[in-house]
Amino acid sequence: RKDKDVDREEFLVSGFEQLSWVNIHKELEETFGRPIISEHDAKLLAYAEWKCAEERQTDRHVSLVALGSVGFGIGAGIIINGKIVEGQLGIAGEIGHMGINYNGKHAQNGIQGTYEYCAGTESAVRYMLERLYEFPESPLTEKSSYWEILDAYKNGDPLAVYAIDKMAWMLGYGIASIVYIINPDCVILGADYPDLPEFLEKVQRSVSQFVHPSIMENVSIRCTKLKEDTILLGGYYIALEKLFKNNLLLERIRQALC
């Protein structure tokens, strides 16, 4: 976590017995002999999206929320007025822990009612397993991964369609809360979610069930258009801005990359 009582660039590790309260920056800088900059992966993803967002062509102060899902979790980066929202302890955007099912029970890897449990990419695997034996013709098995489900979804497999559609609905259900809490100009889904019109339509339809039409008209919900490693690209931008202050140079680099 970020310790607000020390230098802003000092990061301490907690929650890992063998690394408890290790100053990661100090250790890495001594090892590599170079300055170290650390940031949360979802925040880097969001910053890269903001830098290259088409919405910025008309408004440089566009606010943006980017959602990423890696395995079980969901993380979000929030950009307002060109700044990453950090929060008191640097955990702003940890929306995966947001409860969306009051009756959710405690599970081995968390609470079943959390957003990431219901809408992270791994949720599609559970939804597939729920009805696996109802679809004997499906190519999916008990060992099928999310990516195999996604391939089957693209081929129109009914079981895969059920699993991905349910994930899409739950994803939209959570985005509706984000829209009301943050009121962003755009919400961008990371590359782990299907970049398919039918999937995005399901997400948008879910959001529209819980968000007033006048608000829906003023928020863009779309999939990422970046093809690069977005997290790495975000880290690149952050490092450049910390090392260089020439905004013109940075803008030319941004135009070349986007």
Question: How does the language model describe each region?
Answer:
Residues 1-3, 72-73, 193:
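Short glycine-rich anion-binding loops that position phosphate/pyrophosphate groups of nucleotides
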Residues 6-7, 30-34, 54-59, 102-103, ...:
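ATP-binding/phosphotransfer module of carbohydrate and carboxylate kinases, centering on a glycine-rich
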Residues 40, 86, 223-225:
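Conserved residues in the N-terminal Rossmann fold of short-chain dehydrogenase/reductase
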Residues 56, 60-119:
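Glycine-rich phosphate-binding loop of actin/hexokinase-like ATP-binding domains
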